[in-house]
Regions:
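Long, C-terminal-biased catalytic regions of enzyme "large/alpha" subunits
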Residues: 1-82, 289, 296, 318
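Non-heme di-metal
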Residues: 82-337
């Protein structure tokens, strides 16, 4: 095979003959044999063999054949280049096997809210918290639930736009976890008596400001344009899976850490935060792949647009934190933190 590939390169530039190709192939064999002598475990990859062929051709008198061989390799590499948006019908081989690792990651973190006991949490909320603390918890729970219950169908639709079986499996696994999150926070709203308060959220300016920037982040999630959809993956991963939730997670868990209260709810929040971190990391990995496959999409204008949205998100989330502490800050967790 090596001789044949070299011979084709020589024929393409009308330089050398079969014997010349055999001589170069022999030098390739000798080079690989020397490596084997130094390391008995050494088994060359196809890429390594091709690299040696390039080197031996460049060091021979057949420089034009070397150039032809290099150009052919580059052309073949481009033909093999992956495309995240190109449909693949066959299950295997996976084009993105490392992404499938997110499936067992979620499976290993599996939980349901019925595993936790909330009896003491109800007592804490109704009778042990001060008015300002109760207000902070109420608003925090409403803010989390607005995200977890209302706006999380993105991953379940992923395969329709990124039709790779391994990526579809991740999306479906994430979608199942989002259903568990929605069930958990729906249950917490119920036991804390906050269902009616949840209905009033649309009258809260801070929450509606957040809704507007999140809607902007999601506006391209139904787009048929690959570039626009790629932007929605980035914005969803950044803002909905990360930015919009973690300040509220910190507040809830601080009550358990500093006051030994709300243990059950804190357990739910901790379990949720671990899965949301996994979701966000997956989205970031998708963006890294898209950057590699479509570098021309990520222009200065694109980066500026993302930066502007980050600033808008920061201002909106500041307002949410102000609203959470509308009846006073917590002694053990100042608003500035």
């Amino acid at each position: 095979k090596i001789t044949g590939a070299i011979n084709k390169a020589m024929l393409a530039v009308e330089s050398g003959n079969t014997e010349s190709a055999q001589n170069v192939a022999l030098s390739v064999y000798k080079t690989l044999l020397e490596r084997k002598k130094k390391d008995q475990e050494y088994v060359p990859t196809i890429e390594e063999v091709q690299d040696v062929v390039e080197t031996q051709l460049m060091e021979s008198e057949f420089k034009e054949a070397a150039k032809a061989y290099i150009l052919y390799r580059n052309k073949r590499a481009q033909q093999r280049q992956t495309d995240l948006f190109e449909k693949r019908i066959n299950l295997k081989p996976y084009e993105y096997p490392h992404l499938y690792e997110y499936v067992p990651a979620i499976r290993h973190s599996y939980w349901i809210h019925s595993e936790f006991n909330f009896t003491s949490d109800i007592q804490d909320f109704k009778s042990r918290l001060s008015d300002s603390e109760r207000s902070a918890i109420k608003n925090t729970m409403l803010a989390i639930s607005q995200i977890e219950v209302a706006v999380k169908s993105f991953w379940g639709d992923l395969y329709h736009r990124v039709p790779k079986p391994e990526i579809g499996s991740v999306g479906s696994t994430f979608a199942e976890s989002e259903v568990r999150h929605a069930d958990a926070y729906s249950h917490l709203l119920e036991i804390l008596g906050l269902n009616n308060e949840f209905k009033k959220l649309k009258k809260k300016p801070a929450i509606m400001k957040r809704v507007r920037y999140l809607e902007t982040a999601l506006k391209n999630s139904r787009s048929d344009d690959n570039r626009e959809y790629a932007e929605s993956i980035l914005l969803f991963s950044l803002f909905i899976e990360h930015v919009s939730l973690f300040s509220q997670f910190l507040i809830i868990m601080a009550f358990n850490k500093h006051k030994n209260m709300l243990k059950g709810i804190s357990n739910v929040v901790e379990a949720t935060s671990k899965e949301e971190q996994i979701h966000g990391d997956f989205g970031i990995d998708l963006i890294k792949i898209l950057q590699k496959e479509n570098p021309d999409w990520f222009t200065k204008e694109y980066h500026k647009n993302i930066q502007n949205m980050c600033k808008e998100a920061f201002e909106a989330e500041k307002d949410v934190v102000d609203w959470i502490f509308e009846k006073g800050e917590l002694d053990f967790l100042p608003k500035a933190v």
